[in-house]
From Swiss-Prot:
Residues 21-102, 182-272 are annotated as: Disordered. This is Transformer-2 sex-determining protein. Pfam families: RRM_1. The lineage of its organism: Eukaryota, Metazoa, Ecdysozoa, Arthropoda, Hexapoda. Residues 238-266 have a biased composition (Basic residues). GO terms for molecular function: RNA binding. Residues 105-183 form the RRM domain. The keyword Membrane does not apply. SUPFAM superfamilies: RNA-binding domain, RBD. The gene is tra2.
Length: 272
């Protein structure tokens, strides 16, 4: 009887021990997803905080860079557009001044014959009033008239009368046009072909240097024009010729190296 009670108690103890182990494993299994979820949420919060910090830094950098650009330029885009509009107005004002110049003591005579001299111009305009000076525009290379000149009268009224009376007059077979000068200051010689008469006559060496420089510039310009207008056929022929020349030079070098290569010594066996 006592042995049966002992066996029953052992079975009950083993059963209870199995139940406890099952509960412990179940509790650990249920607690692991919650811990994983909590760690994932903590990592998400960390990422969000890092993103907010990066975003704030990026916004601060953008604002500072925009501020630096504005401080360097000193103006925003509307002011730039205002500046461009002001430039267009200035161009329009200059165009109007060129088309309708103001009355001045200096008048320009255009369309003259290149053979018309300064003395001939003075004889034509001297009858309208005293002339301060006459400036003939001379070509620096040919030393001939460019076909127009500027006349400076002492009085504004005399210049106005000469302009109205001489516009359309025929001088040396050419019909001239007379108009007020745009600039009020004296006309200075300009660089290039359109220049005034030099202050001292050019020597022989300076003229030869001038002509040689001009011929060199012309030949360079002609060479650039010819090189820019090469047809595809000519370019292909040039490529073929250069390639053929390169192949021939390589073959010559190879044959020369072969002929210069050292020969192997021939052994002669003695019969004795």
């Amino acid at each position: 009887m006592s042995t049966g009670l002992v066996n029953a108690r052992e079975k009950e103890y083993l059963h209870l021990h199995r139940i406890d182990k099952h509960k412990c494993s179940h509790s650990s299994a249920t607690s692991s997803p919650s811990s994983a979820a909590s760690s994932e949420s903590s990592r998400t919060r960390q990422r969000r905080s890092d993103g907010e910090v990066y975003g704030s830094r990026h916004n601060n950098y953008k604002s500072s860079s925009q501020h630096r650009r504005r401080s360097r330029s000193g103006s925003d885009s509307p002011q730039v557009r205002h500046y461009s509009g002001r430039t267009s107005r200035d161009r329009q004002r200059m165009r109007q001044a060129r088309d309708h110049p103001q009355a001045s003591r200096c008048i320009g005579v255009f369309g003259l014959n290149t053979n018309t001299t300064q003395q001939k111009v003075r004889e034509l305009f001297n009858k309208f009033g005293p002339i301060e000076r006459i400036q003939m525009v001379i070509d620096a290379h040919t030393h001939r008239s460019r076909g127009f000149c500027f006349i400076y009268f002492e009085n504004l009224g005399d210049a106005r009368v000469a302009k109205d009376a001489c516009t359309g007059m025929e001088v040396d077979g050419r019909r001239i046009r007379v108009d007020y000068s745009i600039t009020q200051r004296a006309h200075t010689p300009t660089p290039g072909v359109y220049m005034g008469r030099p202050s001292r006559p050019l020597g022989r060496r300076s003229r030869e240097r001038d002509y040689s420089t001009r011929d060199t510039s012309r030949s360079r310009r002609r060479h650039r024009d010819e090189s820019s207008s090469v047809s595809p056929y000519d370019s292909n022929r040039r490529k073929y010729r250069s390639r053929h020349r390169y192949d021939r030079s390589r073959s010559r070098t190879r044959s020369y190296s072969r002929s210069r290569s050292p020969r192997k010594p021939v052994r002669v066996q003695s019969r004795y």
